[in-house]
Design a protein with these regions (language model features):
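Histidine-centered beta-alpha loop that forms part of the nucleotide-sugar donor binding/catalytic region
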Residues: 14-16, 123, 189
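Homeobox/homeodomain signature
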Residues: 19, 91-92, 97, 106-108, ...
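C-terminal active-site subregion of NodB/CE4 polysaccharide deacetylases
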Residues: 21-41, 48, 112-113, 126, ...
């Protein structure tokens, strides 16, 4: 479809995913919930049993566990808890990664299309704001180096994992600039203005993900009206 309309696109690659070793923890959580009618989990000092016997109950369980995992203080905490859930309910995270993510050969095929730009997306899809400055910088640099080695071309663009205010802020914007990325995108909703030229590693995006969206709403989203209200009519949200 994009080729038909001569529309360029950028694909941001987390290098562990292309190597088949990534942790798609949110997808693993879906797989855990899909294969059981109830989930036993220890959250803090409380042992919980969550109903997962109906589609609605599964969605509620996913929302509860997803929010808990995202709120854990460190990446190692999240990894520990999702690994325990996967072990208890027989989900192989690496097999999920290999089946769902592009391999390096597939990334190379995609990158050969002149409409396609490949950007970096860290090594492990880590929440950079929860990492030390050293680790966050390394996640950016190593991801970029691995992609450049695989594709034999420079990688100039970056996308922050998760990309919201809890995952990317002023420190991360500065790290991306220091790493030499020409642009870096968040998931903060917003349109592009001339003022964004001074904040090229803190760019907003308009999310067309199908959630609460249909063809009638698309003109509103692309007009900038919705994101203007979201941002309190500020053109730049780079702090």
């Amino acid at each position: 479809m994009l080729r038909e309309f001569d529309a360029p696109l950028t694909v941001y690659v987390a290098s562990d995913f292309a190597e088949g070793a990534g942790r798609l923890w949110w997808t693993a959580l879906e797989a855990v919930i899909a294969r059981t009618d109830q989930i036993d989990v220890q959250i803090g000092h409380s042992a919980l049993r969550l109903d997962a016997s109906t589609p609605a109950a599964k969605q509620a369980a996913f929302d509860r566990l997803h929010d808990w995992l995202r709120a854990l203080p460190g990446e190692h905490d999240l990894n520990r808890e999702i690994e325990a859930l996967c072990t208890n309910y027989g989900v192989d995270m690496e097999a999920l990664c290999r089946s769902l993510c592009l391999s390096w050969d597939e990334v190379k095929t995609l990158a050969a299309d002149p409409l396609v730009t490949i950007g970096a997306h860290t090594v492990s899809h880590s929440n950079l704001a929860k990492q030390t400055e050293e680790i966050a910088a390394r996640e950016m640099a190593v991801s970029r180096a691995r992609i450049e080695q695989a594709l034999e071309r420079p990688v100039l663009h970056f996308a922050y994992p998760y990309g919201d205010r809890d995952a990317a802020g002023e420190r991360e914007f500065a790290l991306a600039a220091a790493a030499g990325f020409k642009t870096a995108v968040t998931t903060r909703p917003g349109m592009l203005f001339a003022e964004n030229a001074g904040h090229m590693t803190a760019l907003p995006r308009v999310s067309l993900n199908g959630n609460y969206q249909d063809a009638r709403i698309l003109p509103v989203l692309t007009s900038g009206a919705a994101t203007a209200m979201w941002n309190g009519f500020r053109r730049i949200a780079a702090a």
